[in-house]
Amino acid sequence: MTARASQDSAALPLDKETLLTVYRKMRTIRDFEERLHVDFGRGDIPGFVHLYAGEEAAGVGILHHLNDGDRIASTHRGHGHCIAKGVDPVAMMKEIYGKKGGSCNGKGGSMHIADLSKGMMGANGILGAGAPLICGAALAAKFRGKGEVGITFCGDGASNQGTFLESLNLAAVWNLPVIFVIENNGYAESTSRDYGTAVDSYVDRAAGFGIPGVTVDGTDFFAVHEAAGEVIRRAREGGGPSLLECKMVRFYGHFEGDAQTYRAAGELDDIRANKDCLKLFGRAVTQAGVVAREELDTIDREVAALIEHAVQEAKAAPQPGPEDLLTDVYVSY
């Protein structure tokens, strides 16, 4: 296992334009999730919702390296991955509201957003189910020979699923261009890591499959971006799979409505005060003198307007009708 420490923000590795793009992505995810928290609480949104707020640095830090030809498989907590991969937030909002014009025409909902045109193979309500899917996508990419990669995300709990471990072995044996990302927020629903696994770090398992593994501070965008860049480059060059663990925090419960009685007193207050990846990123780029606070404030206002527009579009969109019942049932591609 290789542990990677947080990077000194005094020497930022990205130019100003890229930093502003990254901030916009992270802010869009945060505001998107915060608005869902409010609207779900009002009863406006059907089904279940699992929010990515607090984890933005990992999704954006990793997926910033990808293009539309690269494939990803997400999780039940997948809104952040979708936005980071380039899926339209308006189409996503319609999907979550269960409306026509959504990314899956309102039939998938929060846990099953997909957009193949962006390489987003889909979020998945089944824990660990993205791993075998991305192995198939990575095998196809290997045959095409264009240097494309696949990335699958899962939580710390899902990494104990048999499908995940079997996929690690398959990817290693076939030398597939795939990166397995464990987003370790410390809880498998309400079960802490200590109750779910005996290893000190999830990447300790990588050696057993003959692949490299790296652990990073998932609240530090720059640490995630650097580590992800290395394993993605390795995969593009034919070096095979890697395991990347991002130690991170989530601002809300496992699902909306989770009472979070498993958390220690004051834990959430500490997380929001000291481990907010968006604040940490903003502080790093402004203290380095690369970006002015006013520029970030402008992005904040623009993103707020985008999210409000997305919500209004979703509310105004029609529901799927009886004529839609048998469409999208089968797929052939």
Swiss-Prot record:
Pathway: Ketone degradation; acetoin degradation. Keywords: Acetoin catabolism, Oxidoreductase, Thiamine pyrophosphate. CDD domains: TPP_E1_PDC_ADC_BCADC. One of its GO terms (biological process) is pyruvate decarboxylation to acetyl-CoA. It is an enzyme of class 1 (oxidoreductase). One of its GO terms (molecular function) is pyruvate dehydrogenase (acetyl-transferring) activity. Its cofactor is thiamine diphosphate. Gene3D superfamilies: 3.40.50.970. Catalyzes the 2,6-dichlorophenolindophenol-dependent cleavage of acetoin into acetate and acetaldehyde, in vitro. The alpha subunit is probably the catalytic subunit of the enzyme. PANTHER family: PYRUVATE DEHYDROGENASE E1 COMPONENT SUBUNIT ALPHA (PTHR11516:SF60), PYRUVATE DEHYDROGENASE E1 COMPONENT, ALPHA SUBUNIT BACTERIAL AND ORGANELLAR (PTHR11516). Tetramer of 2 alpha and 2 beta subunits. This is Acetoin:2,6-dichlorophenolindophenol oxidoreductase subunit alpha. It comes from Cupriavidus necator (strain ATCC 17699 / DSM 428 / KCTC 22496 / NCIMB 10442 / H16 / Stanier 337). The lineage of its organism: Bacteria, Pseudomonadati, Pseudomonadota, Betaproteobacteria, Burkholderiales.
